[in-house]
């Protein structure tokens, strides 16, 4: 019997790791990856950090350059897909080529959620999703330039830190009443706000841009009535899933390709993962996790499901953020207001714990990354703690 052909669409973390997972889990059939980017699949997290700060930054490839040929994976870079035929199981490129598949993994990622008021500035306005975006930003983030960043989420704050370290004068505008309100607990939000303010970043909360005038400098009028002058304007206010191909193929979408917990779409031969995917949970709610680890996890899950193998157990959600000299790692559930702190954030060394009826369900480490491994195990096992002991620095965590 002829072995099946699997096609992967996308050029990021989830796409590359799907290829790796399929080979690791024993798939020996024909495997193709189609990407509209000219680069080999590369790591996205460094784009807002080392790619802007290092003297001679290099893209960090997800897999070594020789891996693709050694593992007989056919790479098609810099190509654009015109359509997906679900009935014919055919992928058609804009250059007229067509390719047959038995199973398909879609990891087309996401674009920056548009902000038309700023998009009208054209090349004077920046977002950050790809390596070419980082290269453009690196050119304009020069010392003493005034930089306005719209959005105080993870990307916005990482960009604020990098721009400040490059000598720019940075102002961040945020519609909400706090920074990183979507994915950090209140005590970490307060720490980050103070950290950026101490570094010289001006953060304007509960505010938004109402009017823009493009001139020698960009003039931004805010809801508060204040007017800012900017040499560089950047925004990061969320994502818009690259799900057009899926929509045109009549797959179930909702600002993303809807998948089940096996990463399967409404078509049993089509799977999806990474930022483009949104999971329908058992209770019917839709949930998206935008992180490096989630892309890896979903790639492994989809590969197992495609091959009819047992699905790997999901670890607690985890992501990290590097801002200035700080490394913050977030694991587990970030919801809730009853957080306790071990250590002193003012010394830039602390761990915040999220206990629910004594059970550890989440944590954030500040420059304490070595503690993530035991914390992950505790969250997975549902370990209970005495809050007093957990915050006592005289007691080693590993002894608890």
UniProtKB/Swiss-Prot annotation:
Alphabetically sorted, this entry's keywords are: Aromatic hydrocarbons catabolism, FAD, Flavoprotein, NAD, Oxidoreductase
- In the UniProt record, does the keyword NAD occur? yes
Recorded hits in SUPFAM superfamilies, A to Z, give: FAD/NAD(P)-binding domain, FAD/NAD-linked reductases, dimerisation (C-terminal) domain
| Necessary cofactors | FAD
Q: What is its EC number?
A: 1.18.1.3
Q: What are the binding positions for FAD in this chain? A: 5-36
**Per the record, what are the reactions this protein catalyses?**
2 reduced [2Fe-2S]-[ferredoxin] + NAD(+) + H(+) = 2 oxidized [2Fe-2S]-[ferredoxin] + NADH
Q: List, in alphabetical order, the Gene Ontology terms for molecular function in this entry.
A: 3-phenylpropionate dioxygenase activity; ferredoxin-NAD+ reductase activity; oxidoreductase activity, acting on NAD(P)H
Show the InterPro entries listed in the entry.
FAD-oxidoreductase/Apoptosis, FAD/NAD-bd_sf, FAD/NAD-binding_dom, FAD/NAD-linked_Rdtase_dimer_sf, HcaD, Reductase_C, Ring-hydroxylating_dioxygenase
**Residues annotated to bind NAD(+):** 146-174
Q: What is the enzyme's class at the highest EC level?
A: oxidoreductase
Q: In which pathway does it act?
A: Aromatic compound metabolism; 3-phenylpropanoate degradation
User: Single Gene Ontology BP term?
Assistant: 3-phenylpropionate catabolic process
Q: Name one GO cellular component term.
A: cytoplasm
Highest taxon above the source species: Bacteria
For whether the record's keyword set contains Plastid, the answer is no
HAMAP family given in the database record: HcaD
* Function, as annotated: Part of the multicomponent 3-phenylpropionate dioxygenase, that converts 3-phenylpropionic acid (PP) and cinnamic acid (CI) into 3-phenylpropionate-dihydrodiol (PP-dihydrodiol) and cinnamic acid-dihydrodiol (CI-dihydrodiol), respectively.
Quaternary structure, from the entry:
This dioxygenase system consists of four proteins: the two subunits of the hydroxylase component (HcaE and HcaF), a ferredoxin (HcaC) and a ferredoxin reductase (HcaD).
**Protein family according to the UniProt entry:** Belongs to the bacterial ring-hydroxylating dioxygenase ferredoxin reductase family.
What protein is this chain from? 3-phenylpropionate/cinnamic acid dioxygenase ferredoxin--NAD(+) reductase component
The organism is Escherichia coli O17:K52:H18 (strain UMN026 / ExPEC)
